[in-house]
């Protein structure tokens, strides 16, 4: 047994001896709003990890936006010391994971660092689509799963039905399912006992070569990149030379520590433990999530298995509200990128909008969160164009290209074949809404129903193949509307399929506005174009001259609407008198408007761009 001094004052009792058999590493799988952050709050209270005076709701959700929206975005680890009924004090590392579909990449990171998972299900909602997907992921990672039914204190809790759904999903017996009220604290002690009894301790050799998994990284203005790690073998302490496996860069460790949940320095981290390393790393891109950290002097031969690079799924143009704030927007995106490895951006130039950035996101919620954070944390107004996906195009000259910006989509004459991404879409819904959901996906969103599965009493899982472009607009809101809020969804990229795509260009006052152009399936081009020109007609303010708004596809105008000119009464001063005088004044006004129309610039308000995000479903609602 290796002993070394711990300089940390754990409120749950310090231990001076390294005991891997007393370590438990777990993550929490739950759908959005099923109470996982509240459960962690109760665990922090019961184990006295956080002083009662400092305790607040959603303690681990560090961002204001997380607390306001009630969602977890950044997975936040915490270590608690728990004295169990067997008299031993256990070190439990909990990683609270995000539950929204856009942030599932964080869940994969968390699982790779754990031996066990708490499957948390809301007794009033039952098992949701996202939970099913994450449970399969946990089974793939070979995690010991502890099923827990939460919110048992609520009057509408359906415990028996929820237990049946969990049994179907996991194949467990009823006495393995724990009943908890995270809000009241009921059953939390029993859950902690189940963790120490059922989750296996980490395997690993403290005397082996250093092998640590990076499962997250965040940027600090003073300390540089703080790398969140789980050690599998070996030991790391200040002064050690370490190397990141993917790029072979070498750093000297300045500080190691644990999360209580605030960062607390310790003498060293050993095999099986979860903590952080500060080593003067300047950029988060050098500490890639899923990468392996090893000793620079005695490196391991191979990296820890299977972490794939995150690829953005949804793209949009982002422009500053005023052109002079371009530099500030660039700095804001760079700062966000430090803590968000999934965010991608590159400079772009639009004749209509000026200089801005083409950004890549994991999904529509991720896009919304980034926009909101820029507006809040950096006090910048930004204009976002309509989101779109990554298309593949085979040109007649044999070249193959990828398109993320609709304005760069080639002319029809150059295209041999176009492909768009399809996803495997799973929707769990009560039986009475099956017809409405199938109609929404198949008739409105070009999806194809593949399989229908039973998901417990009066609930079914519908599996579709659907184009990603149809999912990113307003699909989530439409699905909730047609199912009265009861349906839940999850999607995963499946493949690229050949598709009849067309670019629709919007012209305002006969000038193309590239930021308003979009790519759509030919069958929906007229319908979408009609809606957009009508919407823009309402949103663009009237000018001194008439403004035509046109939608052009395949070289011809497919929709048009006109904004009437503001008309000044030039005859107000003419009291009777010569009719030719009146004609002359009206003619002069007409000439002036003609000139204005030629040189006049039309200002397009931000609402016009935001309107594009909402087009597609609201007329059918």
UniProtKB/Swiss-Prot annotation:
Keywords: Cell inner membrane, Cell membrane, GTP-binding, Hydrolase, Membrane, Nucleotide-binding, Protein biosynthesis
Subcellular location: Cell inner membrane
GO molecular-function terms, A-Z: GTP binding; GTPase activity; ribosome binding; translation elongation factor activity
GO biological process, one term: positive regulation of translation
Gene name in the database record: lepA
Protein purpose: Required for accurate and efficient protein synthesis under certain stress conditions. May act as a fidelity factor of the translation reaction, by catalyzing a one-codon backward translocation of tRNAs on improperly translocated ribosomes. Back-translocation proceeds from a post-translocation (POST) complex to a pre-translocation (PRE) complex, thus giving elongation factor G a second chance to translocate the tRNAs correctly. Binds to ribosomes in a GTP-dependent manner.
UniProt catalytic activity: GTP + H2O = GDP + phosphate + H(+)
Predominant cellular place of this UniProt entry's protein: membrane
Protein name: Elongation factor 4
Protein family according to the UniProt entry: Belongs to the TRAFAC class translation factor GTPase superfamily. Classic translation factor GTPase family. LepA subfamily.
Paired cysteines (S-S): none
């Amino acid at each position: 047994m290796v002993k070394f001094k711990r300089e940390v004052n754990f409120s749950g009792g310090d231990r001076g001896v390294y005991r891997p058999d007393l370590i438990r590493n777990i993550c929490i799988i739950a759908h959005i709003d099923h109470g996982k952050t509240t459960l962690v709050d109760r665990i922090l209270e019961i184990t006295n990890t956080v002083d009662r005076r400092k305790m607040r709701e959603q303690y681990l959700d560090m961002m204001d936006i997380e607390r306001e929206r009630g969602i977890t975005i950044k997975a936040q680890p915490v270590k608690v010391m728990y004295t169990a009924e067997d008299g031993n004090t256990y070190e439990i590392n909990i990683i609270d994971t995000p539950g929204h579909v856009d942030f599932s990449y964080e869940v994969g990171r968390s699982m790779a660092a754990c031996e066990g998972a708490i499957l948390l299900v809301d007794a009033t909602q039952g098992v949701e689509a996202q939970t099913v997907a994450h449970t399969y992921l946990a089974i793939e990672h070979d995690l010991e799963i502890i099923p827990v039914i939460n919110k048992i204190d609520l009057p509408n809790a359906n415990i028996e039905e929820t237990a049946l759904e969990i049994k179907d999903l996991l194949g467990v017996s009823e006495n393995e399912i724990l009943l908890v009220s995270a809000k009241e604290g009921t059953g939390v002690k029993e859950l902690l006992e189940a963790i120490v009894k059922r989750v296996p301790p980490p395997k690993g050799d403290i005397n082996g070569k250093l092998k640590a998994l990076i499962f997250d990284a965040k940027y600090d203005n003073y300390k540089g990149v703080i790398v969140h790690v789980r050690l599998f073998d070996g030991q790391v302490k200040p002064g050690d030379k370490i190397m990141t496996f993917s790029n072979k860069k070498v750093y000297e460790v300045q500080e190691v520590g644990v999360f209580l949940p605030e960062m607390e320095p310790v003498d060293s981290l050993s095999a099986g433990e979860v903590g952080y390393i500060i080593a003067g790393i300047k950029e988060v891109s050098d500490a890639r999530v899923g990468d392996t950290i090893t000793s620079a002097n005695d490196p391991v031969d191979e990296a820890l298995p299977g972490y794939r690079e995150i690829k953005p799924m949804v793209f949009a143009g982002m422009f500053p509200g005023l052109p002079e704030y371009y530099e500030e927007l660039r700095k804001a995106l760079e700062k966000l990128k430090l803590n968000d490895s999934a965010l991608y951006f590159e400079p772009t130039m639009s004749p209509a909008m000026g200089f801005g950035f083409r950004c890549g996101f994991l999904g529509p919620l991720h896009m919304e969160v980034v926009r909101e954070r820029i507006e809040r944390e950096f006090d910048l107004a930004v204009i976002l164009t309509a989101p779109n996906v990554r298309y593949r195009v085979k040109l007649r000259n044999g070249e193959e290209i990828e398109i993320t910006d609709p304005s760069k989509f080639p002319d029809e004459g150059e295209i041999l074949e176009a492909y768009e991404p399809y996803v495997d879409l799973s929707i769990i819904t009560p039986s009475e809404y099956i017809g409405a959901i199938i109609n929404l996906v198949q008739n409105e969103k070009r999806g194809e129903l593949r399989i229908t599965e039973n998901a417990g009493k009066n609930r079914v899982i519908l599996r579709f193949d659907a184009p990603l472009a149809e999912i990113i607009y307003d699909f989530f809101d439409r699905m909730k509307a047609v199912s009265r809020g009861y349906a839940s969804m999850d999607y995963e990229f499946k493949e690229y399929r050949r598709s009849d795509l067309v670019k629709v260009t919007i012209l305002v006052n006969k000038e193309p506005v590239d930021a308003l152009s979009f790519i759509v399936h030919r069958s929906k081009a007229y319908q979408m174009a009609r809606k957009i020109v009508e919407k823009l007609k309402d949103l663009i303010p009237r000018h001194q001259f008439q403004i035509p708004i046109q939608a052009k596809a395949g070289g011809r105008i497919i929709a048009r609407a006109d904004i009437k000119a503001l008309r000044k009464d030039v005859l107000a001063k003419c009291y009777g008198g010569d009719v030719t005088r009146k004609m002359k004044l009206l003619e002069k006004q007409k000439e002036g408007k003609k000139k204005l129309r030629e040189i006049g610039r039309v200002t397009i308000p931000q609402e016009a761009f935001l309107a594009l995000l909402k087009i597609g479903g609201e007329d059918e609602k």
